[in-house]
């Protein structure tokens, strides 16, 4: 069925500078044991070379999920362009039970028609499991490929794909008038652009529920301040600039509130702002430090870091106040939690015996799993479908972004070429 992609104009980001020094995913572990699949190079039906390798993007997406291992083109028994051309037995002989085929056709109006079919080669050989086509301009060819990937991934795994999401992060470059940059890129590092440049540090970006805004911490006024920036036009709204510390913003899933930490009265405590009215209410109090709030799916409950027991651990509390409940018990300390979109688990930065790694806490069973083995891991952020975590870690003298699947099996890194990269934040579905 023909489907014309309708994407908000705001995401063209015409006001922002597109960068050439982009991050790219480099897989380091786990793909070899993933489910094999065939993603045939999409047939180009125009003159010269295709403007984008759509089939290659689909294959990379499925590989980056950690759940699939597309075979190399030189191992494919055939390279069909349509389902009717697929010979199922040739693929099942290689242990492959599903094949993606497709075409890209240029139109007279300058647009492109991208079509794909997902073909079953084992259960019901030759059956088309999913198919779609998209009419897009050249600049949206990657988006069309990610859309196909999302549909294929969901059909085969039962999990909603997150290949059309984005990541925000802070890059500290070497020198220059504005060495700190808040950037946004597609989840795979492509289409990177600058949201904000600053001579002073930028920290802790957080996405709004609809993906149209970013909250973050800036020090441009000489002290910390919390701001919200609209991506479509660059407009900045100052949220908090109280004495001492203003930090750790987190939008509620329903989009109505922003939680953050302030130390205007001495110790760090949690506060929540009603974004419509601007009214701020205090959630925690006392002499302990309470910070790094993150919301549960109900938009009423917060997980956060507190040192009320001596060392940092993760607790939860109702945003309207009440008694806190401790969530983490394993390890010397746990902090900087992020709760999954379904509320079934959270990830933290866990420290024990001098090591600092990303851990997963199952909120149903209480089971804890250490996911990473990198060095000085920080600021984890979960993909909206709950399958992957992005975080920063130390590598050499700098900081880089890393990916790990929430089962700990698949690992990858996103090295940058022009600075240290910190504070990654995964967007909601866009």
UniProtKB/Swiss-Prot annotation:
- Write out the similarity annotation: Belongs to the TolB family.
Domain of life of the source? Bacteria
Biological process (GO) annotations? Answer: cell division; protein import
Oligomeric form and interacting partners: The Tol-Pal system is composed of five core proteins: the inner membrane proteins TolA, TolQ and TolR, the periplasmic protein TolB and the outer membrane protein Pal. They form a network linking the inner and outer membranes and the peptidoglycan layer.
User: One Pfam match, by short name?
Assistant: TolB_N
Compartments in which it is found: Periplasm
Q: What are its GO cellular component terms?
A: periplasmic space
The cross-references to HAMAP family, in alphabetical order and at most eight, read: TolB
Signal peptide start-end: 1-21
Under the heading SUPFAM superfamilies, the entry gives: TolB, N-terminal domain, Tricorn protease N-terminal domain
Q: Give the protein name, as stated in the record.
A: Tol-Pal system protein TolB
Listed A to Z, the keywords are: Cell cycle, Cell division, Periplasm, Signal
Tell me where the transmembrane regions lie: none
What does this chain do?
Part of the Tol-Pal system, which plays a role in outer membrane invagination during cell division and is important for maintaining outer membrane integrity. TolB occupies a key intermediary position in the Tol-Pal system because it communicates directly with both membrane-embedded components, Pal in the outer membrane and TolA in the inner membrane.
Q: Which InterPro entries does the UniProt entry name for this protein?
A: 6-blade_b-propeller_TolB-like, PD40, Tol-Pal_TolB, TolB_N
């Amino acid at each position: 069925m023909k489907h014309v992609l309708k994407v908000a104009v705001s995401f063209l980001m015409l006001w922002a500078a597109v960068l050439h020094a982009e991050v790219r995913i480099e897989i380091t572990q786990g793909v070899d044991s993933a489910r094999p699949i065939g993603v045939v190079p999409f047939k180009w039906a125009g003159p010269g070379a295709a403007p984008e390798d759509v089939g290659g993007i689909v294959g990379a997406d499925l590989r980056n999920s950690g759940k699939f291992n597309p075979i190399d083109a030189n191992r494919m028994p055939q390279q069909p362009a349509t389902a009717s051309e697929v010979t199922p037995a040739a693929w099942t002989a290689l242990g492959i039970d599903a094949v993606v085929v497709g075409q890209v056709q240029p139109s007279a109006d300058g647009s492109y028609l991208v079509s794909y079919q997902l073909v079953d080669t084992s259960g019901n050989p030759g059956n088309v499991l999913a198919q779609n086509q998209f009419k897009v301009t050249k600049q949206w060819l990657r988006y069309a490929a990610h859309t196909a990937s999302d549909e294929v991934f969901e059909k085969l795994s039962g999990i909603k794909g997150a290949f059309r999401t984005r990541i925000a992060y802070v890059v500290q470059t070497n020198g220059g008038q504005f060495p700190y940059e808040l950037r946004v890129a597609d989840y795979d590092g492509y289409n990177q652009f600058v949201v904000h440049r600053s001579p002073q540090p930028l920290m802790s970006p957080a996405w709004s529920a609809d993906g149209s805004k970013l909250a973050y911490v800036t020090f441009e006024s000489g002290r910390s301040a919390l701001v919200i920036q609209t991506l479509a036009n660059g407009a900045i709204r100052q949220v908090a600039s109280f004495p001492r510390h203003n930090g750790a913003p987190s939008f509620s899933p329903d989009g109505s509130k922003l939680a953050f930490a302030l130390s205007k009265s001495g110790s760090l405590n949690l506060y929540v702002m009603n974004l419509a009215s601007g009214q701020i209410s205090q959630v925690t109090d006392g002499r302990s430090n309470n910070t790094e709030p993150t919301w549960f799916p109900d938009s009423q409950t917060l997980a956060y870091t507190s040192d009320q027991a001596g060392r940092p651990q993760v607790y939860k509390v109702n945003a309207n106040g009440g008694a806190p409940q401790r969530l983490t018990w394993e390890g010397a300390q746990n902090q900087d939690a992020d709760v999954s979109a379904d509320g079934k688990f959270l990830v933290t930065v866990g420290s024990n015996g001098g090591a600092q790694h990303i851990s997963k806490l199952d909120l149903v069973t209480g089971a804890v799993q250490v996911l990473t083995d990198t060095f000085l891991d920080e600021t984890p952020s979960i993909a909206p479908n709950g399958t992957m975590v992005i975080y920063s870690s130390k590598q050499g003298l700098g900081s880089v972004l890393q990916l790990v699947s929430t089962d700990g099996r698949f690992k990858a890194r996103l090295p940058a070429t022009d600075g240290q990269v910190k504070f990654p934040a995964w967007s909601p579905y866009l």
